Structures are given as structure tokens and as C-alpha cells.
Amino acid sequence: MTPSQVAFEIRGTLLPGEVFAICGSCDALGNWNPQNAVALLPENDTGESMLWKATIVLSRGVSVQYRYFKGYFLEPKTIGGPCQVIVHKWETHLQPRSITPLESEIIIDDGQFGIHNGVETLDSGWLTCQTEIRLRLHYSEKPPVSITKKKLKKSRFRVKLTLEGLEEDDDDRVSPTVLHKMSNSLEISLISDNEFKCRHSQPECGYGLQPDRWTEYSIQTMEPDNLELIFDFFEEDLSEHVVQGDALPGHVGTACLLSSTIAESGKSAGILTLPIMSRNSRKTIGKVRVDYIIIKPLPGYSCDMKSSFSKYWKPRIPLDVGHRGAGNSTTTAQLAKVQENTIASLRNAASHGAAFVEFDVHLSKDFVPVVYHDLTCCLTMKKKFDADPVELFEIPVKELTFDQLQLLKLTHVTALKSKDRKESVVQEENSFSENQPFPSLKMVLESLPEDVGFNIEIKWICQQRDGMWDGNLSTYFDMNLFLDIILKTVLENSGKRRIVFSSFDADICTMVRQKQNKYPILFLTQGKSEIYPELMDLRSRTTPIAMSFAQFENLLGINVHTEDLLRNPSYIQEAKAKGLVIFCWGDDTNDPENRRKLKELGVNGLIYDRIYDWMPEQPNIFQVEQLERLKQELPELKSCLCPTVSRFVPSSLCGESDIHVDANGIDNVENA
């Protein structure tokens, strides 16, 4: 095939060590794999922005799509091995840039990085090979700093974190276009009801600790076990004579954390208590409570740059989302007629026009992702020499293997309070296969039509402010392992399905965002509630701080308890003004009048029970949109369909044409 030399040009500014690179849909551009992307070289300085250029040989007359990104190209771990690429920012327009070269030589001036067709769309990168350490100081359970020295007991403190790693020799410093080692990065974030702030630098005396504010330090590194992290503590509200006579005014002490301490624990999350040493005498004057999480890249799976929906939401009318499929069948006032979180329940909601079906996912003992709402279930046991053969024992789902979940007689924990336990167990035993609880996530992905969206709630143990834990489980899986298994299952089996993750656990949301670049996540929050007990995590206590957290983590949006939205409807427009998508959930959403109000107020999605009570069997909005597109593109289809599309026409009516639409709503176009 005739070659064409294409010179790609982009303008933009970089941090020291960063490069611009291009990644696209052909071999020469890496086939969307950033590890095989082509780095651009600097041409000249054009004032505020530098021109970057790469000349690449493409096939003439063949259309190619591509995107630009900026990041680091690191030294290979082994001699002759592949280099590692860290993506800091990348272009995520729904339609990538494209070119069809028709000449032997061509120059493509793509203007400013991130701007395509006059629209700027950039997203942060994901973890490719680096590790992220998060250190947090907050008042969720108790004040993070405790001082024993009498004269400081009532003082307020400011904290500054200093990051130390291996020092580089001068010979190791290289130009930004050559492979190099990644320098450690530090970002400081302050999250509250009113705002969030992200900074790469700190004041000389750091930031103040406040009861209503979450302080977080994010460190990205290639050497997670080789860092020294130093907390310096400064007293606030100093008198003038103290300030004038001190080179470090108010500095009272220091606490040191070696990252190897975290690495050796083998845990993805935890709390460390560090001694604070006096500045002068080096005696212990108190302690600091440091909450941490470690986020590792997703192993065994490489995210590509073909598409991303992490921050994309198409403007539409509010979407109907089937809660646990066809609805709550265990704990609400009016129970669903189909058992919740089963394939039958999900299929029922889908057949009644649900745009998405919402369900809960966690792991069995042998690490199989299963769909089930509660963290515990009841195991049926038969007692010897007892006329009543049914005895129920509550057991965590995580203590049973997938095969045991399929074979043992299990029932919902509400059976413990049931007057007729035997009846509930018999009902479980006589269920049809699609009515069986605990289907695997893979089974659900394979069983339902691809044009039904999935809102996958990732279950995790939550602690209440009174100290109680969900299911009385104070320990759970390792968070990295837990999410790696669930995310890989989804990424490898999702096809073209629309997927939105959600979770009540803020750290789960953070990890999902950092581990993959394809699917969005919503932060679930109950806000201020008279129904549910307050949660321990400060980020979960109010809808405003949930918004700030979602902005800070660059999430798609929030999923708010309807009780809180009905009490504070202004939250809806406030969230939208901050660029967030907003869903709602809760029993109040089951009221059709509440749904009408919420839709008028602009909620993007409503999760509710028994969708079959309100909507007839019909295609969902995605199927209708697909059919409308086909009608516009294929005139022959118009004669086969009635003007008002309320459901798909059977393919038999289109017998005279080569075009038909399958009953499941997936278009099947032959010879068109």
C-alpha cells in the first residue's frame, strides 16, 4: 500500500519531564495502546505554548483515528524491555481526531492540546504502572492529632507533609524527550461542604486541621516502599513576639512515616498512629492518627485509549432505573413479585423499559463476583431428633464459595424474623434457575440484552458513626484484590453495554476511578437522613460534601437519597452547576408524584422498585434511539413501522426487506 508521511503538530505546555504523545487506531500509532504510542519532539517556542511534532508513515487513503496525551515515558525495567508510560492528561472527545492521508507528504496542525472542533475535553490519566498512596487527616471518628504536652492541649494545628525519596545524581537528569525515571508527585486536597481545593504546593506552615474538613495527601510513585514521609506540626494563633523570634514560628514537632511500614503490612487500607516528636528535645509530645489507602494498577489488563465514558453523559430525559432489577423483594413495604437481584428480576425490569438495571456485587469466598444485596445470608441447617427440621444461621456471604452459594439451602436474613421459616426456605428451593439468588456477575453480563444498561453497585462494609459495621463485619477482603477481580470481570465481558458503577464507600469510588479509564462511577450518599443512621466517614455525611468529593476525584457524579433531595431540591441544580450527573435512590422514589417532581427538577436517573407497575412491556430509551437512527438512515424501514414507536415491530413484518430489528432491540442490518 502506498505510504504517506504525516507530520502531526500540537501546541501545549508541559511540566519538567513530561512529553506529548500520539496514540491511534493503526499499528504506526500503537493501536490505541499508550505503551506503543509515539512521542512528539519540541520544534520551537511560540510564546505561551511550545510546538511539538512527530512525523509518522501511514497508509495513503486509509482513515485513521487518534488522540494526544501527555505524561512520562519511563526507562524499561530490563535491558531491551518495553518502556512504561504514565498518562497524566489525555483527550477524551467522544469522536477522536481523524485523518485520511491522500498525499505523499502532509502536515496536520491540530492546534492546542485538548481542543478538537472547538471543544476542550481532557481527562486525568489512570494508574498504568505507578502506585498511589493516599494519606488522610480528618475528624470522622476522633481528632487526628492528640497532644499530651499541657501548654499545647488547647492549641489548633497546621500540618505540612514533606516527601523524601532516593536522590538523583546530576548525571541522571535528562531532557524531557528521553526516557527517564519518574519523580514522585505530591498533591494536597482539602474537601468540605463548601468547596474542594487541590494544590501541588503548600504554605510554609502547611494547612490547618478543621473538624468539618477532610485533608488528603496523594502521592504517585514507582517506589512505594522507598519513601520517607515527614509531617511537621505548627501551632496556630501565635503571639507576635513568638513569630518575630523564631525562624520556624510555631513549629512544635515532627512525625515520620516510612512507606515501607505500609508496604510490609500487606494491606490496601488502614490507620497508623505515629508519635509526634518535640522540635527541640526530641521527646514525644503527642501522636497523629493517619488514615491511608494504597491504590495499585489493575494487573493483567491494559486499558486503551479507544474510548472513555468516565466523564461522559449524553443529555437525555431522566432515565428510569430498575432497583435490584424489578425491585426490593425483602425489606420494603410493598415487595416486588420477582426475587431481587436475580436474572429473572433484571430481565423483568429490562422488558418494561428500564434504561438501566441496578444491582449489587461482591465476592464469594473463592473470589467469584456474585450479585446479591446483603453482606450476609441465612444457612438452613437440619437438627437431629427435632420435629422442626429448619434452623437458620446467619453467615457472611464471603464465607461461602460460589458452588456453596448455588447448592446450599440459603435464604434472606429477614427469614430470621419470619413466622414461617419453613415456607421461605421451600420457596427458595423450588425456584426456577433464573430466579435463583447469587448469579455470578459474568452470568448476568452474558444473559441480558446488551442494550440494557447496568448500574453496578460495588458493595463494601460501611461503619456507622456509633461504631457498628454492616453485617457486623469489621474486616473484609483486601480492597485492591476485591476491585481487581470485579473490574476485570466487567471489562472483559461488557461488550458495548452502557455501564455505570456506584458505591457508598468513597475509597471504592476513588480506586475504581484510578484503576480504569472506561466506565464512570457515582458516589452513593444518604446525606442527612431520618431513616438511616449516620455513617462514620465524613465524606458520606452530607450531600454537599459528597459533591465536593466527587469533584475532587473527577467522578461522573453522585447518587443521592431521595429523602435528602425532597428536603433540599436546590442540591440538584447545585450538582449540575458543578458539572456532576445526579441520580436518586430510596423508598421515596417509589412514589410516582415524587418521581414527577424530581424529573421536573432535572435529576438524570431515578432508581425505584416495581417498574412493571408503572410501565408496560416496551423497549427502553436506548432501543428507541437506535430504531430512530435506523429509520433516518434506512428509508425502507419507515414503511415497516408505525409512526409512533412504542415497541419494536416483529421481523416477520419486514419480510419483503433485507432489514430487520431483532426482538431484543439489537439492530441487525444485512446487505445495507
From Swiss-Prot:
Record SUPFAM superfamilies: PLC-like phosphodiesterases, Starch-binding domain-like
Chain sites annotated for binding substrate: K70, H88, K89
Mitochondrion listed as a keyword: no
Transmembrane segments: none
The keyword Acyltransferase appears for this protein: no
Family (UniProt): Belongs to the glycerophosphoryl diester phosphodiesterase family.
Protein known as: Glycerophosphocholine phosphodiesterase GPCPD1
Organism: Homo sapiens (Human)
